[in-house]
């Protein structure tokens, strides 16, 4: 059996696709999933945390809530295969999801499920390919078999650093891409932004030990393309609202907002130039206006690509 902690859009979508083929217990804190879909018969919905603690547990909670959950429930989670289903960098520690798992539950295989996907597509059974990253190769093979379905295809890697950073950094670039479209700057500007943003992703990830092929795969480039080109992306929609000077629903989780600050801190610590990420952070925090952010990026010194 599989347990899923968190009944937000992604956790519910995973419950639906996995529950078509095997028993799943979905923990919803309030007892109601966020995604309005019919759950398969093999999916048990519960508000009891303990009922969702299977041998394999998917952690489908917001990135900034993951560390607190792991620390609070470490004793009950210890020894189970733990798969993070969120993207970002923890503001308190600077760790990614698998780092938080390893710190709180050192006896558990730590993995992350990431890549280009929208919850609605997964729930509808549309073909989707994701990356499953874990440094435990035996656990990775077992999880790959257990979590793959007829419509959900998983590719395995041991490069947790690359997989985590690809998923985290693309959210920051997606906000910037949304700003470009929201401000009416055009498709050419978005293409340039995505390309230069990808270069920033590579610089930081490689400096932190990621493999280049991971950044060029599903969890990096694949996720970047999807998130920067669709208004199904919450990060992209948030950026659009920023660019247009419009209000945005404050109840919607936008992982890239917090990630931008953490990414800038990492970049400074490692001496990596990330002007787009820095401008996103400054814009989100209100330290610069949109015209100032645009002017700052366009007035940078000319250089070789």
UniProtKB/Swiss-Prot annotation:
One of its GO terms (molecular function) is NAD binding. The active site is at residue 170. The keyword Cytoplasm applies. Pathway: Membrane lipid metabolism; glycerophospholipid metabolism. The keyword S-adenosyl-L-methionine does not apply. Sn-glycerol 3-phosphate binds at residues 87, 115, 117, 170, 223, 233-235. Catalyzes the reduction of the glycolytic intermediate dihydroxyacetone phosphate (DHAP) to sn-glycerol 3-phosphate (G3P), the key precursor for phospholipid synthesis. This is Glycerol-3-phosphate dehydrogenase [NAD(P)+]. It comes from Cereibacter sphaeroides (strain ATCC 17023 / DSM 158 / JCM 6121 / CCUG 31486 / LMG 2827 / NBRC 12203 / NCIMB 8253 / ATH 2.4.1.) (Rhodobacter sphaeroides). The lineage of its organism: Bacteria, Pseudomonadati, Pseudomonadota, Alphaproteobacteria, Rhodobacterales. The gene is gpsA.
């Amino acid at each position: 059996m599989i347990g899923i902690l968190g009944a937000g859009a992604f956790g519910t979508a995973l419950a639906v696709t996995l529950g078509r083929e095997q028993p799943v217990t979905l923990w919803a804190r309030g007892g109601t999933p966020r995604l309005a879909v019919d759950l398969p018969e093999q999916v048990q919905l519960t508000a009891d945390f303990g009922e969702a603690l299977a041998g394999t547990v998917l952690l489908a909670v917001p990135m900034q809530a993951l560390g607190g959950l792991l620390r609070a429930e470490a004793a009950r989670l210890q020894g189970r295969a733990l798969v993070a289903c969120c993207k970002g960098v923890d503001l308190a520690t600077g760790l990614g999801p698998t780092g938080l798992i390893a710190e709180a539950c050192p006896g558990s295989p730590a993995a992350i499920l990431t890549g280009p996907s929208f919850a609605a597509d997964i729930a509808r059974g549309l073909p989707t390919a994701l990356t499953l990253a874990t440094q435990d190769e035996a656990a990775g093979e077992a999880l790959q078999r257990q979590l793959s379905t007829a419509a959900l295809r998983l590719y395995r890697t041991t490069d947790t650093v690359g997989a985590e950073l690809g998923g985290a950094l693309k959210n920051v670039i997606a906000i910037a891409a949304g700003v470009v479209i929201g401000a009416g700057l055009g498709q050419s500007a978005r293409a340039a932004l995505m390309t230069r943003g990808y270069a920033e992703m590579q610089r930081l990830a490689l400096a932190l030990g990621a493999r280049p092929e991971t950044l060029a795969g599903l969890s990096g480039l694949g996720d970047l393309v999807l998130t920067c080109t669709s208004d199904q992306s919450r990060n992209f929609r948030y950026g659009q609202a920023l660019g247009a000077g419009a209000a945005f629903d404050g109840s919607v989780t936008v992982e890239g907002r917090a990630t931008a600050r953490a990414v800038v801190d990492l970049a400074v610590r490692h001496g990596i130039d990330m002007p787009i990420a820095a401008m996103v952070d400054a814009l989100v925090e209100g330290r610069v206006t949109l015209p100032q952010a645009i002017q700052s990026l366009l007035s940078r010194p000319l250089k070789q690509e």
